[in-house]
Swiss-Prot record:
Biased composition (Polar residues): 1-12, 246-258, 362-372, 713-733
Chain intervals with Acidic residues compositional bias: 231-245
Organism listed in the record: Dictyostelium discoideum
Protein name per Swiss-Prot or TrEMBL: Uncharacterized protein DDB_G0271850
InterPro entries linked to this entry: VID_Regulator
Region spans: Disordered: 1-52, 145-174, 219-303, 347-374, 542-658, 676-733
Signal sequence interval, chain numbering: none
Compositional bias ranges of the Low complexity kind: 13-51, 148-167, 286-300, 542-616, 633-654, 689-712
Amino acid sequence: MSESQQKNSLQMNNNNNYNNNNNNNNNNNNNNNNNPNNNNNNNNNNNNNNNIKHEITNWSKLQMILEKYIVKNNISSLDKGMDLLLQWFETISKNTDKINTFKSIVGISPDNNSTITGRMSYSTSSIGDLISNNTTDDNKKRILMDVNNNNNNNSNNNNNNNSSSNSGDESTPLFDFRNKRMKVSRLLCHEEMLHNPLNENNNNINNINNNNINNNININNNNNKHHGSDVEENSEGTFDEDENSCPDSFDSNDNNSPEDAYGGSDNESPHIDDDNNVIRSHYGNHHNNNNSSSMRKNNSGTHSTIDLTHIKLPSQMQQHQQIQQQLQMQQHMQQQQLQMQQQQQAQQQAQQQQGGGIGKSPTISGNNSSIAPSPKQLMTIREKMLEYIQKNPSATRPSCIQVVQQPSSKVVWKNRRLDTPFKVKVDLKAASAMAGTNLTTASVITIGIVTDHKGKLQIDSVENFTEAFNGQGLAVFQGLKMTKGTWGKEWNLTFIAVVRPNNASYNNPVIISVSQPFSIVVKTRKNPQIRHNSYSSHILNNNIMSNQNNNNNNNNNNNNNNNNNNQNQNNQNNQNNNNNNQNNNNNNNQNNNGGNMNNNNNGASENSSSSPEVSPTIAPKRGRIPNSAPQMSLSSAPTTTPPSNSTSTTTTTSNGRTFGQDEMASLLWAAEIKQKEQPDGEPETIQGNNNNNNNNNNNNNNNNNNNNNNNNKGNQNYNHGVILNTSKPVTTR
């Protein structure tokens, strides 16, 4: 090397330049003269890096760094830069190990304590050294391109991430940039990483090992070539190592990479501006045991290469072991499922063997879903039934089954069991003769098939349509539950006797006999409540209670009369007592008569089918009293004491509701008119004698307070109260 070149190298080292290269000073000056824009870009980049040195604290801000400080400042064509980033992240996002390798490249050490999974486990790792201690990712790519031009062997060991797009310019449409920006954002924020295949892991291992070997070879070659001075060893050895300092297996390292077409030099040579100020480019620390590396550390401080040997990758043997364990677990689960299926099949075969074929199967009574045919099999049975009917007309049709009991009416209530069930009896001798084999009650079943008038089969109309014969040879059909679509329609129910198959399959059914069709109609009850004589006993209990109330009224009247001796004269008290006794006697007579009338009326309308929702709850329209209104006496007896203290008389019914005089009278009229207008309607419970206690107390108070007036308005005694909420016992069969 010439003296001028050595002086230049010494001058560069004295100026604290940590990125030495093997170019001479003239080349550096040419680079500075030819690429002033690149120098300015690098100056701006380093200034921006210093500004955001303390702002980047987590992995999520990597997107902003890549877009703002790498793409815009160091790549002249923004569209090309986005294409590179997009392809690069599409490659590394498929492999967790590649993501960890990338973190190591940019200065992020993966957390060895955490378990490596298929997710981005290190999303909160610090990347503060990404900008402050490292140059841009494209600088590394540029160096790799220079190295690959000289070393073609290294290009076969790295992954191929070429960009096939042509060289672009600054006039790229904005929407293209935004679309690519969104793609990069998705790749950066996408945490559901795919599981790494074996091939990618093997390629990563080979690439990393080959890169490390090439690094060592290049370093040794450089050390053997240069023995002139320490400066030459440091400068040239450092440059050779810097060429291979970024063995990024995810970037394109072949000669056809479009990075050469990008404007602006991204190499690591020192860029000298107009003021001859040297701009340093920072790199992260690395671990290298080579002599030249240690000498460079003593001289250059922070400048280092990146060694990927500390990255722990799962070995191929471990991966094979994990796959084998998973396969063994799957095989074990499959074997368990096969064993369960075999056990179930063995149990079914044992049950069939215990049955021993037709005539030897166990007796089944009641509804059994296991003997019921499927809808498809039911269609086959119906076809066989039609063939049987065509061959055997009704006049000459032999029959081994007989319907010995059927409902009293053809009405089938909605969601109700039949009031009287169908009972079908089988004649085993006739059935055995028809089937040509000895049959028992357990080997014959009966099926109820519902069809419409046109003979169309209604599969979904009957819930339980298959019954087995009991020991007496009877099959009981009581659970005929009809669906909603059958309400209000008339259907035909036909019973057929079928030989019960051993394998519970009706693909080839043997029909023994077919009964005559029975008409059924599905209706809905307006009032499904069934009334009985307990309602009359309820009225009787009310009358007994009313008589007890009358006796209590007499005692209360006597007590009230005794308490008023201080205010009235003895003669007046005696007269009041006589009047009260007479009132009580009249009340008792009327109460008894009213109770008997109520019993007669309620007993006559006991079987009414109207619902209780039609009871009147409002008073009739005001106006003239109709001619059909009942002649009702609002006073029970002629008393001579008008009211003085009470302004309105109230009446309390048995349900605790209080009515005034006018409202009570209106309710009574409405009840009587409703009964006459609708004789078949819901019987309104006219319960008397429940209000005598309060009414008689009011009457006695009125009689004792004012003894001069003989008006009978104060002694109005209502013996009838309308019970609007009467509890009715509900029984269903």
